[in-house]
Amino acid sequence: MDLPVNLTSFSLSTPSSLEPNRSLDTEVLRPSRPFLSAFRVLVLTLLGFLAAATFTWNLLVLATILKVRTFHRVPHNLVASMAISDVLVAVLVMPLSLVHELSGRRWQLGRRLCQLWIACDVLCCTASIWNVTAIALDRYWSITRHLEYTLRTRKRVSNVMILLTWALSTVISLAPLLFGWGETYSEPSEECQVSREPSYTVFSTVGAFYLPLCVVLFVYWKIYRAAKFRMGSRKTNSVSPVPEAVEVKNATQHPQMVFTVRHATVTFQTEGDTWREQKEQRAALMVGILIGVFVLCWFPFFVTELISPLCSWDVPAIWKSIFLWLGYSNSFFNPLIYTAFNRSYSSAFKVFFSKQQ
């Protein structure tokens, strides 16, 4: 019983020369506040601008779809669903993640808000990823099956994809809360993160990323093959020049009639076909860039998210932040990519702003 008393009196009467040791012990028990260097302030400011730009751009796309009557049909309902998920990322996820970064990745806002933030994070990001997948599937079917993929079928299929997107995202995000599938908040260490339960890690990463990744890669491979096949079939629809004169005799009806063919070019391509091919090429390029940016943004995060709990690999905090915000940035790039390859949005933006003035 004397040992704690002596330690207490020693700690209270510690001379100033031993002050660094006492402060070191205090830091072990309770981490100090993060030092806001100029570089850190700059990074946090840029992240704040990213959140604001993501919200503004997606809200503009969503408002345009709601205001312009011609956009009240497919595939713009898929774009609206994607814009909603990305707006929610900017409103519900990014601000609290920015607070988390500002406090040195320590969560000081309580268990309830931590659970709500993680659920919104998984819900909105998963929905954004599956909305990209739905747009890629819609483009694939419209390019490769444009005869049977009618407007009525397209509308029904797109509505089903939107419903499945949000249903699957809800199940993945609420599974830890509803079924006690791991813990998201640790009060002693002030940690707030997605459940590290290995079974949930496999379930969530496969459902939120690896499955849609396989779908979009398969879709783009099929689009590439379809485009390559169309180029090949277009070449076979023409007759090349004949190097030498060829005599063709019709011996059955007119024995004395001779045709001389020196050059013949037959094409089956109309102006409508050319317009359709140009539209399909733009759509294929848009889907390719959309998929490429999606993979670049989310692949590092989900690789570490899967390997870290399964292999007990402690990823440095700085890399966790980089990979997480790189994934968030996909919500900023999505509307930029889609509207850049759709001329109707450019004219719709002009009409929208002209009416506001």
UniProtKB/Swiss-Prot annotation:
N-terminal signal peptide: none
Protein known as: 5-hydroxytryptamine receptor 5A
Stated role: G-protein coupled receptor for 5-hydroxytryptamine (serotonin), a biogenic hormone that functions as a neurotransmitter, a hormone and a mitogen. Also functions as a receptor for ergot alkaloid derivatives and other psychoactive substances. Ligand binding causes a conformation change that triggers signaling via guanine nucleotide-binding proteins (G proteins) and modulates the activity of downstream effectors.
Encoding gene (name): Htr5a
Positions glycosylated per UniProt: N6, N21
Topological domains annotated Extracellular: 1-36, 104-114, 177-198, 313-314
Lineage per the UniProt record: Eukaryota, Metazoa, Chordata, Craniata, Vertebrata
A Pfam family assignment: 7tm_1
Tissue note: Expressed predominantly in the central nervous system; in the cerebral cortex, hippocampus, habenula, olfactory bulb and granular layer of the cerebellum.
One example GO MF annotation: G protein-coupled serotonin receptor activity
Keyword Disulfide bond found: yes
